[in-house]
Swiss-Prot record:
Name of the coding gene: OVA9
Statement: the UniProt record of this protein carries the keyword ATP-binding: yes
Species whose genome carries this gene: Arabidopsis thaliana
Chain positions covered by the region annotation Disordered: 188-220
Protein name: Glutamine--tRNA ligase, cytoplasmic
MF annotations from Gene Ontology: ATP binding; glutamine-tRNA ligase activity
Length: 795
């Protein structure tokens, strides 16, 4: 429910007066709780006539983050903010931590001021000294990596020693020191484009590709290190969330000091995260973002990340998927601290379910699935909701022993059927399934639900940060309700936007459908954005991780990232790592008439564009003989001013070889199809043609070059968002998404290429050797073309 219009406009005016922009102000009034809190904060701070934007932003944070167990102290904090004694987000976060720990108890002002850095002025000289010290410590690395140095790490070192330093001054001095040490950027430094500041994407809109624009805006701390948004484990005593019940009561979930101390003793204060995939399908690029968040946070903080298989559905899990997930996680560069399964905890989960019943928070229900759905829609309690605890305990034991038929009973959590949050409608904790479990065997015939097991195992594994995508945000109330009901340790929960990319589908159901029904060639089809498909296509894990890091860990949901952005990162990586070679896709024979038929000239071709002449490994040998092949697209009968290919009477340069001039054209019987070209070469290289062509020659007279198969891939779906087509999404599949060229010619050095090897086919794109290759028959997948459209406008 939104406030009435007259009150809404007054609230908007009030919020704008403290520096909020109109859009933020209007979004705020859609949340009654935040509106009420912010209005109260503004009045408590006595700034109803307005204030500067920095103060207003701090007040907004107080309204949304102040620990509810210390509301009595909020006026004190507001006084410090208005008087500019607390003026940075870092100081404010320290204040929140202080008050969350203090609660409603009295405190000493000097201890509060010390905890928040009040009165501490960090001079530019102090910052300059700290920056100088960090550069001295890391000088060798900086000189090696030059402008590819991770500036975020340098920034973090300075902030660690000077937590109250102005981040803008820190960044400015780091930039100046980099320039002082390295000088102007070289061409090599500039290979990687300057990071652009992106416009905030509108919900459900495809990310717009803007022209490259230089910006002088200072990057935020989150841009330098995306993990700074997450609190430290010792701060996990603050109120995690508030659960509003239909009777007006509020559950404010937080860890007690005793519970948190016990947790910290077990973990040693380290960060513990988990990556919890279901083993019922192959991982896709969205999972790459989840891995970056889960494993990345643990790595950045020197902590641990579990790989935990959420194997609560015995009918869906397969060993194939388990093996695939473990392999892909390692390929992506992540090392699990420990591999666990939810099924490892089946006994503990059962015991806790019994305890939940004993505490009056769960009951055995006999409603059918349709009845449960109907009662939820009507917000009605189940007829069995208030049955005696002993009766539910007995029935739950019978469920466990297999006495009750499948579908005749479930264990449901006694939450709040009248709540505004449908994820509090007495969610199912256990259901009966007479199916053996891939790991637990036939020991169990009841299995826990995701809503029951997920949060409970998080607690049992002492997870500090439970991170998931935004569609799970409404489940947060149920997550904390259950842990609170069982008096268990509560992890810090945070949701981020899921990764959506254009021209594909990432729904597990849809992926499974097109794989099962052979619209594609398996889970690792190179047209899919499954991680195995991307790997088979030739994409590196480094490129995928760079793509994910570039997107950031945001909460702006509903946006779709254009696939060209991913391709940009792929090109950046392969440009540095893929050696150059030459392949002709559609060969056209060229006879060099002024070269003897038995003559073979061995030439040097560059593997790398910046190859040094004194480095033999940077070159490979190519033969130049009387018969060479160019691509059919590089010849036409009629020349034009803007055409740089070969034409009758025209010269071109064969890359790494000689200029050639077309002297004659031989047609097929239809007098239209060009069968071969006759040309003369310029051994002295006196002519300087503008056009440069790639080519492949016979390695010896009469012996054709190596023949290879090349597969060209385009976008799998024609529409940027096929999901918008609802049930008609299959009609959007691009029938031309895969083209196979079976008669391409390659230089002889490629004959020893192995599966997974990546190359740049000059003038064509990046390609990788496919697993379908056999001795004597190489198959290449096109990874990506050479042209980069990301950030250049248009498609």
């Amino acid at each position: 429910m939104v406030l009435k219009d007259d009150n809404s406009e007054k609230s908007i005016e009030l919020f704008i007066s403290i520096g909020l922009d109109e859009k933020t102000a209007r979004n705020t009034i859609n949340n009654n709780k935040v509106t009420a809190n912010l209005t109260a904060v503004i009045h408590e701070a006595a700034v109803t006539d307005g204030c500067d934007r920095n103060t207003g932003n701090l007040l907004y944070s107080v309204a949304t983050k102040f620990p509810t167990n210390a509301l009595v102290h909020r006026p004190t904090l507001l006084k410090y903010i208005v008087n500019s004694k607390i003026k940075t987000p870092a100081q404010l976060e320290a204040a929140f931590a202080f008050f969350a720990s203090t609660g409603p108890e009295d405190f000493k002002l000097n201890e509060f001021e010390e905890a928040c850095g009040v009165g501490i002025e960090v001079s530019p000289e102090d910052i300059e000294k700290a920056v100088k010290g960090i550069f001295e410590e890391n000088k060798k690395t900086i000189l090696e990596q030059r402008y590819r140095t991770n500036v975020g790490e340098l920034f973090g070192h300075v902030r660690k020693s000077l937590p109250w330093a102005d981040p803008k001054i820190v960044k400015k001095l780091i930039d100046e020191k980099m320039y002082e040490l390295l000088g102007e950027k070289t061409a090599a430094d500039n290979e990687k484009p300057t990071k652009k500041k992106e416009k905030k994407e509108k919900p459900a809109k495809v990310e717009e590709k803007k022209a490259v624009v230089e910006t002088t805006a200072e990057p935020s701390e989150e841009e330098l290190n995306p993990y700074t948004i997450f609190p430290q484990p010792e701060q996990n005593f603050m109120v995690h969330t508030e659960v509003f019940f239909s009777d007006g009561s509020i559950l404010r979930c937080s860890n007690t000091k005793e519970v948190l101390d016990k947790h910290l003793k077990v973990t040693g204060g380290k960060v513990y995260t988990r990556f919890p995939p279901e083993p019922n399908g192959y991982l896709h690029i969205g999972h790459a973002k989840a891995m970056f968040v889960d494993f990345g946070l643990a790595k950045e903080r020197g902590g641990c990340c579990y790989l935990r298989y959420d194997d609560t559905n015995p009918e869906a899990e397969k060993e194939e998927y388990i093996n695939h997930i473990e392999e892909i996680v390692k390929w992506m560069g992540w090392e699990p601290f420990k591999i666990t399964y939810t099924s490892d905890y089946f006994q503990e989960l059962y015991d806790l379910a019994v305890e939940l019943i004993r505490r009056g928070h769960a009951y055995v229900d006999h409603q059918t699935a349709d009845e449960i759905k109907e009662y939820r829609e009507k917000k009605m309690n189940s007829p069995w909701r208030d049955r005696p605890i002993e009766e539910s305990l007995k029935l739950f034991d019978e469920m466990r022993r297999g006495i009750i038929e499948e579908g005749k009973a479930t264990l449901r959590m006694k939450q709040d059927m009248q709540s505004d949050n449908f994820n509090m409608y007495d969610l199912i904790a256990y259901r009966i399934k007479f199916a053996p479990h891939p790991k637990a065997g036939d020991k169990w015939c009841i299995y826990p639900s995701y809503d029951y097991a997920h949060c409970t195992v998080d607690s049992l594994e002492n997870i500090t940060h439970s991170l998931c995508t935004l569609e799970f945000e409404t489940r947060r109330a149920s997550y904390y309700w259950l842990l609170h009901s069982l008096s268990l340790y509560m992890p810090y929960v945070w949701e981020y936007s899921r990764l959506n990319v254009t021209n594909t589908v990432m729904s597990k159901r849809k992926l499974n459908y097109i794989v099962t029904n052979k619209y594609v060639d398996g889970w690792d089809d190179p047209r899919l954005l499954t991680l195995s498909g991307l790997r088979r296509r030739g994409v590196t894990s480094t490129a995928i991780n760079a793509f994910v890091r570039g997107i950031g860990i945001t909460r702006s949901d509903g946006s779709m990232i254009h696939v060209s952005r991913l391709e940009h990162h792929i090109r950046e990586e392969l440009n540095k790592t893929a050696p150059r070679t030459m392949v002709v896709l559609n060969p056209l024979k060229v006879v060099i008439t002024n070269l003897e038929s038995d003559k073979l000239i061995e030439l040097d071709a560059k593997r790398w564009p910046d190859a040094q002449n004194d480095d033999p490994s940077a070159f490979y040998k190519v033969p130049f003989s009387r018969v060479v092949y160019i691509d059919q697209s590089d010849f036409r009968m009629k020349d034009s001013k803007d055409y740089y290919g070969l034409a009758p009477g025209k010269s071109v340069l064969l890359r790494y070889a000689f200029p050639i001039k077309c002297t004659n054209v031989v047609f097929a019987d239809d007098n239209e199809t060009v069968r071969e070209i006759h040309a003369e070469y310029d051994p002295e290289k006196k002519s300087k043609p503008k056009g440069v062509l790639h080519w492949v020659a016979e390695s010896s007279p009469g012996e054709e070059p190596i023949k290879v198969e090349v597969r060209l891939f385009e976008k799998l779906f024609n529409s940027e968002n096929p999901a918008e087509l609802n049930d008609a999404w299959l009609t959007d599949i691009n029938p031309n998404s895969k083209m196979v060229i079976s008669g391409a010619y390659a230089v002889s050095t490629l004959k020893d290429a192995a599966v997974g090897d990546r190359f740049q086919f000059e003038r064509l794109g990046y390609y990788a050797v496919d697993k379908d290759s056999e001795p004597g028959k190489l198959v290449f997948n096109r990874t990506v073309t050479l042209r980069d459209s990301y950030g250049k406008g248009g498609k």
